[in-house]
UniProtKB/Swiss-Prot annotation:
A Pfam family matched in the record: FKBP_C
Function: PPIases accelerate the folding of proteins. It catalyzes the cis-trans isomerization of proline imidic peptide bonds in oligopeptides.
Keywords per UniProt: Isomerase, Nucleus, Rotamase
Cell compartments where the protein resides: Nucleus, Nucleolus
Name of protein: FK506-binding protein 3
The PPIase FKBP-type domain, residue ranges: 332-418
InterPro entries for this protein: NPL, PPIase_dom_sf, PPIase_FKBP_dom, PPIase_Fpr3/Fpr4-like
A single Gene Ontology CC term: chromatin
Catalyzed reaction equations: [protein]-peptidylproline (omega=180) = [protein]-peptidylproline (omega=0)
Biased composition (Basic residues): 93-103
Activity regulation description: Inhibited by both FK506 and rapamycin.
């Protein structure tokens, strides 16, 4: 079964005493059934166990062969005539029998025997027609003893297969629609025809026109052939030289082309510079958080003061990189933050640099203790680095990307305050 490639899930509900086709006509795909399960809800008061049966057409049964064997080479008109002749013969025989002096009882007994023979023939015909289908039991399921039964049945679309359930419970079949190796399209005769056409076309290319054949006859001599080839080569060379001379541009045209190329190059460089400037604006905040304020100009660098460093409760260190404007946040303030969290070795384990800011109520225990202490006092637009010892971070607790007893460094920026 390893060659069967699952395509989709297969499910089929079978109601009691309702023959159900295994494959729908609208989806002619091979199925593999792997499980039969009983619905524990009974559909009648008897609550009899449900038996699942598979009904399939007998491959040895053939309607056409049987009909052909019976009819032979006769047509319908000949059969009708022969039936009429047989009826007349039977009537004449019955008259002769009566003329021979048979009693009424004997005649009645003979008629009963004939009727019995006819009934027997009908039963035989019914039995023969029953052989058209084969029935097999797959499983008997009951809520009291067995809810489900594993199966492994593969059914192709060309097979005429139905399922039927006898009992008080419906049965559900599950499995997969699968791609069977035999489902692959066979070798098409049209491919042969196409290949023959291609080979025929190729052969046609090898044939020569009458003019070409005449030229070959004229050049029977090997020396003539060589001379002709030499002439053709010289003609081709002279043509190529003329073309090269024509293609050489004038000096003025070259200068104009160079000027146009320079202008295009300038435009490309200007657009690149504009794009770079936009990108620098976008990532300016991110770079400030990760690497500190960028050094844009030497004059500004001289004027800037060094970040103010403070040590707070529990050894928490804060460095104010940029001082915000407005009122400072305090306990109970609702603050919106951008941040980048790093381990002591510089590895980033978490960040919020775009999208919706991280919002929390300061001093209410909604974040780690180091944040409640380290963020207090910041104003909107302020940027700060907070170094938090392990006891004021996650302590001995290990989280994804954060080992136990880790010292954490956060570069934060206050973007909103309520």
């Amino acid at each position: 079964m390893s060659d069967l490639l699952p395509l989709a899930a297969y499910n089929l509900n079978i109601e009691p005493y309702t023959p159900t086709p295994a494959i729908d006509v609208t989806t002619p795909v091979t199925v593999r059934i792997t499980m039969a399960a009983i619905d524990p809800e009974a559909l009648d008061d008897e609550k009899n166990p449900s038996t699942l049966r598979i009904i399939k057409r007998n491959p040895d049964y053939d309607d056409e062969d049987d009909a052909g064997g019976l009819l032979g080479d006769y047509d319908e008109d000949e059969l009708d005539i022969s039936e009429e002749e047989e009826e007349e013969e039977e009537k004449s025989k019955s008259k002769k029998g009566k003329g021979k002096g048979k009693s009424k009882k004997q005649e009645e007994e003979e008629e009963e025997e004939e009727e019995d023979e006819d009934e027997g023939d009908e039963e035989l015909i019914e039995i023969d027609t029953d052989d058209e289908f084969q029935e097999f039991v797959l499983a008997t399921l009951s809520p009291k003893t067995q809810y489900q039964q594993s199966l492994d049945i593969v059914i192709a679309p060309e097979e005429e297969v139905q399922f039927i359930v006898t009992g008080s419970y419906r049965v559900s079949l599950t499995g997969n629609y699968v791609k069977h190796p035999f489902d692959a399209p066979g070798y098409d005769d049209e491919d042969d025809d196409e290949e023959d056409d291609e080979s025929y076309d190729e052969d046609e290319d090898d044939y020569l026109t009458p003019d070409e054949e005449a030229d070959l006859e004229e050049l029977e001599d090997a020396s003539d052939v060589e001379a002709k080839i030499q002439e053709l080569v010289e003609k081709e060379q002279s043509k190529s030289k003329k073309n090269n001379k024509r293609k050489q541009p004038e000096p003025e045209e070259e200068e104009e082309e160079e000027e146009e190329e320079e202008e295009e190059q300038k435009l490309v460089e200007e657009t690149k510079k504009n794009k770079k400037a936009k990108k620098e604006k976008k990532v300016e905040f991110k770079k400030d958080l990760e690497e500190g304020p960028t050094k844009k100009e030497e004059k500004k660098e001289e004027k800037k003061e060094k970040p103010k460093t403070k040590v707070l409760e529990g050894g928490i260190i804060i460095e104010d990189r940029v001082t915000g404007k407005g009122k400072a946040c305090k306990k109970g303030s609702k603050v919106g933050m951008r941040y980048i969290g790093k381990l002591k070795n510089g590895k980033v384990f978490d960040k919020n640099t775009s999208g919706k800011p991280f919002v929390f109520n300061l001093g209410r225990g909604e974040v780690i203790k180091g944040w409640d202490i380290g963020v207090a006092g910041m104003a909107v637009g302020g940027e700060r680095r907070i170094v938090i010892p392990a006891p004021y971070a996650y302590g001995k607790q290990a989280l994804p990307g954060i080992p136990a007893n880790s010292e954490l460094t956060f570069d934060v920026k206050l973007v909103s305050l309520k």
